[in-house]
Every structure is written in C-alpha cells, then in structure tokens.
C-alpha cells in the first residue's frame, strides 16, 4: 500500500475548502452540518421503503374506459416543469391541457371546464415579489380570476395540486381554498440559498387523494427551490396542519438536519393537504422522477437508469407514478 488514510479523514480534507466558501456565502451552521456528515461512519446511505406494489397500475380500468378527465397544467411567466407534469397526468389517464395565466385572463380557457388544476414549479415573475406571491396576487386582485378560482375550489368534484412554485402560490391563496386555513407560507430556506438535490422523503398517512395507499413509503425525490421553509409565523397553525410529505434522514427519521432537510422546516414538513384531501401542495418535484431514466440515483431493484422501457422493473416507472394514478382513481 502506497498511501492509506480513513475515508472520512480524506473526505473532510477534500470538502474543507467548499465548507469555508459555503460558510462565507450561505448559512455557516448549514455549511458545518453538511461537513460534519463525514464523521458519520455508519451512515447507511439512502434507504428506500415502498409500502405498495408499484407495478400495479390502479388507473388501468379507468384508462381502458376511454374517459379522459381534463386537468389544467397551469403556468405563469417564469414557470417550468409543465411538460413533465403534463406527461405524468397524460400517462395516468387524463387529458392534460397546457394553460397559461393569459388563457384564463382572456377567457380562452375556463376553469369551469376542468376537473383538475395543477400549478407547476419554477420562478414566476423571478420571485421578485416573494416566491409565488406575484402569481397569487394576479389571481387574488383580479375579480374575474378570483371568482373563477373560488368557484373551482368550491366544487366537490375537483382537485388541485401545487408543486414548488405552485405550492408557494397556492399557499398564498390558502384563504380561498376550503380546508387550507392551517397551511403555512413557504419562505427562504434556512440554508439561505437555492437547493437542488435528490432528497429522501416519507409519505405519512393522510387524507390526500394523491397519496392514498402510499402511507409509510420512503423514496427519493427531486428538490429545487430557494424558498421552501414552512413558515407559520405569517399564517397557518403548525399544530393543526395536515402533513402530506416530510423529509427524513438516511435512517428514516423525520428530520430538521441539513442537508437531509434542505429548507429547515420543523418536523421535516415539505407538503400539506386538506381534511378532504382534494387539495395538496408540496415543495419537491414528483413529476421529475416518475421514470427510472429521470433519476440521478435509484435502488437497483427499480432497474438501471437506462432501463426505461416496458421490460424494465415496474415498466420503467418509479413509485411516484402512483401519485398521478391515484388522482385518476379518485375521479372514477
């Protein structure tokens, strides 16, 4: 042996410069917390637990019927991921429509014709008014739009999903969403920077129509946001809110520890829902990880990253596809 040192010691030497830069640029406590992970020699790495059969396509009977309920994939200037979102809902048996806010403002498309509404991620208006705030105000302070959204939310046969920027936007509209009065606002990450990671999350038991049958599942998901901290100082009630998703560490425990929890929310909270389950918002991006080929890492049991065809385990789909199929089953 020419050279021999413990892996943790070499890792700390390698990461020291990055730690110093991060401590100057971002939250120094988070910089130290990430650096200290090198001291955990027993870290098992990401541990996945799927509490359902991901090979079962529960939406198949509804797809076979030929009926395709309409879902609006809503976006605003600066949004993204609408293509991945539309693809996932299309595969789950919906007719996914690309809807820009100008389509609603001009009357080209009506929410009254939709059964589902999905607000996608991104950075509407560059987040200059606060993440999702400008988008929400476009709705709140326009009589045509506020009436249309209130009517849509008030119908008993509709659902809505907000992801990332859409989560921030819908949280800012909590006052007009039935059952969302306990939702927080989502504000700047504790790390004081934009976080783009593959993070481990647990899906707790909840009434969310999107998460039915998934309770107890722990899976990786894409994260990409700068303002994901669940902030109850501005609105909401941490004691009453219904969790739909939370960050966990590599031992499966809900955590506030950085970087397992990239935004620092108490109890790992990163997704909430309503008591009837029709409305759910979350900061992570399930639409970006619905297939093996979209994953930067996945368990070998899911198939290799380049196995995306029908011969791959689960047909090339990850367990996240169940979220979209659940919505189709709920519509019936």
Language-model segments: residues:
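Short acidic loop-to-helix transition motifs that present clustered carboxylates
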Residues: 99-107
